[in-house]
Amino acid sequence: MANTLKLPVGIDDFRKLRESHFYYVDKTRLIEQLLLNWSEVTLFTRPRRFGKTLNMSMLKSFFDIGTDKALFDGLYISGNKELCDEYMGKFPVIFLSLKSVEGLTYDEAFEAFVRIMGKEVTRLSFLADSDKLTQIEQEQYKGLTIMKNGRLVFDKEKLISSLQLLSQLLYKHYGKKVVILIDEYDVPLDKAFQNGYYKEMVSLIRGLFGQALKTNEFLQFAVLTGCLRISKESIFTGLNNFKVMSITDSRFDEQFGFTDSEVKKLLSDYGMDSHYDEVKEWYDGYHFGRADVYCPWDVINHVDHLRDDSAAKPQTYWINSSGNSLVRRLINRADSSTKDEIERLIAGEAIEKVIRLDLTYDEIDNTIDNIWSVLFTTGYLTKIGEVKLPDSESYAYKLVIPNKEVREVFVLQIQEWFKAVVANDNDTMKLLSKAILDKDETILARQLNIVMGRMISILDTKAPDDMKENFYHGLLLGLLRGSNPDWLIKSNRESGDGFSDILIKPENPDLGIVIEVKYAKEFKGLDAACDAAMAQIKQKRYDETLRDEGRCDILVYGIAFCRKRCMVAGEKL
């Protein structure tokens, strides 16, 4: 029974997954497609956590000489006997994953690179004594293993030439050209960009790829994966037989991520069919080529949690697996037009953008449109259509936030940004606090409207009215807590005959403040909403808790909101 199989949470080693009997969503058609759409160098660009590393590990297991062919028993590729006979286990493979090449300095990142290369060199230790190699070639291999103080000795030139040298030695040993697999090729560039050594890392990667992929006569073919397609002029200079399979390409569009039918089968296998709608709402929505796919990391993690707790709620697994600095970068640079576009996305609408798929990292901040492009290629936005630009042969993409989880990324980043904005605006906060204490409804409304005019709304326009009211309640609560740290503020606590939205206990022991929040669908309804709030305070006797504590001077406010405007009514009871 499939539901007795372990779920591969965090397992990206194909051999381990198959030998240890983990559940596997069959992606071996990738092998067939790769060979039928052959290119000397193929780059797959996909967002984080979409199965890139597992697929690369699967390719290694298929092509590598001496592989255990039983790993593929019962999988799609085993049905193509002719292809398996010709290619399975027939090539030496070099496999590097660059996902851990990082450091605060270039030297730290270089050492991390050397450790990864050294691990692969050590795996090929049989070359040191190969009788197919000349003594000079054996010494060349041993030159890659020289240690000093427990660390491999590599300089830049040695690292750059290492892949090409290993290819040559493996070809000499086996009499077969080499398959090179490089996973997460752009992580070192991303980290270098973030930490200020981008040019040095570009030089290193360009040199390594130039020798390994361009002038390597011992190369059968190479496959690379990453999140971004770095422009050919930056990294892949001179590569002629080079294909890029991005998220817009229909080829291979179902081989990274789970399709709807695969998710339905997974849920059925574990007896969780009833959770289909929530899984789709939270983790589906990505459009690669002509395929609609789910994030596999999310689906596997959620099903695993459901096995332990049938009442488990969807979580933001993808968000928590790494940083979300791109969204924050967009928000920090947003002008009024960009803020409006973000609000439309949050509300579930589409925006239209011309997308560049071949940026370099050092171009990301050149224009705000470049940030939109990177948000698209890294999975924060997805395409639902195209629009032809006027007087042009070019097209703009219609972009949306793919699902609830990614919407949560935007919401959380906007909230953090807004907290920082509020914390740094002492003048507005002081005026807000003073207006409340002085019962100055005009100044209070003006300051609230100023603040809301600067914010990015995270209001879901499709949400029911009570949820919209909750949004404004949370917004006001955050502002009040930032306006006067000496106030004791209680939210939605029981008082009198019901629950008051907000109770404030200032330093003055005689003074108490009650605030009721209302949502109005239209601006013309703000007056009536304020009146309803004031009537509710009196009818429900929300002031009783404060009076029971000896606070005899009570100020009450009804505050009504509509979009980015509010109206305030106040009274002393």
Language-model-detected regions and their locations in the chain:
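Domain-level recognition of nuclease-like catalytic cores that cleave nucleotide substrates
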Residues: 545, 549-573
